Amino acid sequence: MADGTVILDTAGVKRALTRIAHEILERNKGVDGLVLVGIRTGGVHLAREIVARLEEIEGATVPVGEVDITLYRDDFKGHAPHLPVGKTDIPFSLETKRVVLVDDVLFTGRTIRAAMDAIMDHGRPACIQLAVLVDRGHRELPIRADFVGRNVPTSLKEKIAVLFDAANRPTDVVLEK
């Protein structure tokens, strides 16, 4: 476990993800036309957890994909270091779908902007909604989450770590000073 204060333990993470799943269903009136896309890597694991809950509640399959934002980051324009580019896997059409973009922590909004650019390169969804496990504030762009597990005001020096077990299930959320 990372050093710091546990702000969500395993049970709290499970409750937050279940609540997010219910909120997604309520906002979208079910799962028809709904797809989830997780941002690599933590968002992918959380998207799969949310999809499992959606499918359990609704008894219907919900497509889930993953997006890598490396090539869309605005902090590397023109001078990109040699970063490993991960896999984007969206094995379904996004055209006219309601996309729920999933990430672990919302901070400045730049990761979300990059992910939206990547999604738009794969098609034109009817809408994009955002689900995050933790919103820590400090936005640099006008982006807000539609579904939030926990709002955690932080200082710029603090970090939020979402921890996962060996099976990539979220276990704890830790505030690191």
Swiss-Prot record:
Task: Kindly state which keywords UniProt assigns to this record, in alphabetical order.
Answer: Glycosyltransferase, Transcription, Transcription regulation, Transferase
Record bears the keyword Transcription regulation: yes
Domain of life, per UniProt, equals Bacteria
**Enzyme type, top EC level:** transferase
Instruction: Write down the Gene3D superfamilies for this protein, in alphabetical order.
Output: 3.40.50.2020
Please give the catalytic activity noted in the UniProt record.
Answer: UMP + diphosphate = 5-phospho-alpha-D-ribose 1-diphosphate + uracil
SUPFAM superfamilies under this entry?
A: PRTase-like
> Cross-referenced InterPro entries, in alphabetical order?
PRibTrfase_dom, PRTase-like, PyrR, PyrR_bifunctional
The short motif PRPP-binding is annotated over: 99-111
| Entry EC number(s) | 2.4.2.9
**What GO biological process terms are annotated to this protein in UniProt?**
regulation of DNA-templated transcription
Q: What does this protein do?
A: Regulates the transcription of the pyrimidine nucleotide (pyr) operon in response to exogenous pyrimidines. Also displays a weak uracil phosphoribosyltransferase activity which is not physiologically significant.
Q: Which family is this sequence assigned to?
A: Belongs to the purine/pyrimidine phosphoribosyltransferase family. PyrR subfamily.
The protein, known as: Bifunctional protein PyrR
What organism is the protein native to? Answer: Geobacter sulfurreducens (strain ATCC 51573 / DSM 12127 / PCA)
List the top taxonomic levels of the source. Bacteria, Pseudomonadati, Thermodesulfobacteriota, Desulfuromonadia, Geobacterales
Q: Which gene encodes it?
A: pyrR
